């Protein structure tokens, strides 16, 4: 059998180079096809990765912690305590690179001309900056200086619809834990630009401590967002956060929070494997 195999190999080799132009054209076509597949796979992987990163900037974070009923009813009644003890220790331990606790509640914002329903975000700018979840661009003015900043930052689209501008005062209204209206006047200190106009219209930024005081919730927060700068490895470190959080809090990865992005990533991985 070994001799037959050698004879077949010699005949095949001679046949290939009997018409060397044909063979070179075939090899060139195969090479171009292989490199085209590699290029397309890399391009699609890059597009998928960018889509996931953009999605995590909106969520944000690879893991989020909430009160178990918060996602179905995002009111201050379903707030959670600020991280302490074991949970705080887990958040400060590698591979976690950044985390931020924020107040996130539905609200109404009113100017002299109009009013709109929005999502009010009470943030600590330093923590959000480390998490990479600040607005893409500040068009006018500035962002909040700290968690006690008494100004608000609006999206450009929202500012146009409210017919307000930098330096003007607006009123923000929401509900406290007793279902009473909680409101305060704030000055617009910044106007931001986001990738999507819908985000500009939805999110209004304020100081976390200012909102906690307005809503009379003490140091409670709506959610904690956590990042380790590697969304593909989230399953390796998320269980430690879940164990530290205990049974009274809900800990979800980005794949559970955004099933569309997770499906896109799985499809891309399958395409690359094939």
Indicate residue ranges for each PLM-predicted region.
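Mechanotransmission and gating elements of multispan inner-membrane complexes involved in transport
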Residues: 176-272
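Hydrophobic secondary-structure segments that place a key small or acidic residue at a functional site
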Residues: 102-103, 114-123, 137-209
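Hydrophobic, regular-secondary-structure patches
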Residues: 35-119, 142-148, 243, 247
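Hydrophobic side chains in well-ordered alpha-helices
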Residues: 51, 87, 130, 236-237
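Loop-to-transmembrane-helix entry motif
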Residues: 19-23, 54, 264-274
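N-terminal Sec/SRP start-transfer signal
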Residues: 1-38, 57
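Cytochrome P450 core scaffold surrounding the K-helix E-X-X-R motif
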Residues: 127-135
